Amino acid sequence: ACRSGNGLVLANAAPIMHSVFELLTGPKEDIKGVRCCVFVTDSSGVLLTKLDSQPFPIRPGMVFDERLIGTNSVHSCMENRYISTVYGFEHYFEEFSGYVASAAPIITEDGVVHGAFGVLLHCGDYDLSIKAMSDVASKAVSSLVNSSVHRSHREFLLDHIDDAII
């Protein structure tokens, strides 16, 4: 039910999620081999989808609301409209105490927050490149969502202009 209204975010986030996941877990020698979870939420902080290399304590449908699970990067990034990183000891929710999460908002140029793009890792696997990667990925998804919104507006206008001219 939560996923139905988020097709635009899911469709545009999927290729970016796969790229980030492959970069972190794939067979080459860069930052590879990291145990991670790459995820996307909707504008209410509901986890829509994830890619993980092993079981992590999040699942689709989970709500990243501070009132429910305490301090978390998803809620913080959407509230502050800026990337947020929360380290293990900063999590109120005990299941997250061994993890670090970086999340950044998916925002279109009209100022609408559509969700968040994040990476969750074990604390020992974290370095600052993960924060940068989350931020760049959210901006890429934001750009794709923005293009899709403009495309649908343009198609709507063209459909109605044709009707008006005829």
Predicted feature locations:
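Short, flexible loop segments at the rims of nucleotide/cofactor-binding pockets, characterized by
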Residues: I16, M62-F64, S142-N146
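Generic macromolecular interface patches on structured domains
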Residues: P55, Y87, S143-S147
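Residue-level detector of alpha-helix boundaries and kinks
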Residues: V9-N12, E29-D30, M62
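Sensory modules in modular signal-transduction proteins
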Residues: M17-T41, N146-I166
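Sensory/regulatory domains in signal-transduction proteins
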Residues: S43, I58-A140
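Extracellular/periplasmic ligand-binding regions of membrane signal-transduction receptors
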Residues: A1-I16, D135-S142
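Bateman (tandem CBS) regulatory domains
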Residues: G5-L8, I58-R59, I161
